[in-house]
Amino acid sequence: MKISTVFVLAAFNRLHKKMNVLYHDYAKSVGLSDAAFWLLYSLYEYGQPCTQKDLCSAWFYAPQTINSALKSMEEQGLVSLELAPKSRKNKQIFFTEAGKVLIEEKIVPLVNAEELSFERLDEQERSQLLEITQKHIEVLEQEIAKIE
């Protein structure tokens, strides 16, 4: 690996970490754990109804993580779980009124900030960011698969 690649990769990794810290700090500032924050964010983004399986697939969380966060949120009166039609096992997740209020107060403002920040990039920059990030993830997956 070239020295310049090492420095660029280190800078990229710091930026990635900084992005994670931004979300972690925001979640903490509004009184949410990371898992609860991302679960609420996911439910808002995904729309209702959805299942735990949908969330695990969309956000790459372990089922146990989603299950624990959902149980806690159900106990807090933020979500309700109901059996999906024609299912004996899969439950759909619905916001309660308290959950809807929490989403409007804590998640929607962040989503709006994300959208505003993304809109400050021009259309070509947004497209390039997505394309390059996707390509990097695909290549990294391939390289990791070689060492596993």
Where are these regions (language model features)?
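C-terminal regulatory/oligomerization modules of transcriptional regulators
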Residues: 1, 124-148
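N-terminal helix-turn-helix DNA-binding core of bacterial DNA-binding proteins
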Residues: 21-65
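N-terminal positioning helix adjacent to the helix-turn-helix/winged-helix DNA-binding module
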Residues: 4, 35-36, 51, 98, ...
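Short, locally clustered residues in the helix-turn-helix/winged-helix DNA-binding domain
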Residues: 13, 41-47, 107, 134
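Alpha-helical DNA-recognition elements
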Residues: 25, 68, 72, 135
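Alpha-helical linker/hinge and terminal dimerization helices associated
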Residues: 15, 19-22, 102, 106-118, ...
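Charged, amphipathic alpha-helical coiled-coil/dimerization segments
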Residues: 71-131
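N-terminal leader segment of winged-helix/HTH proteins
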Residues: 1-30
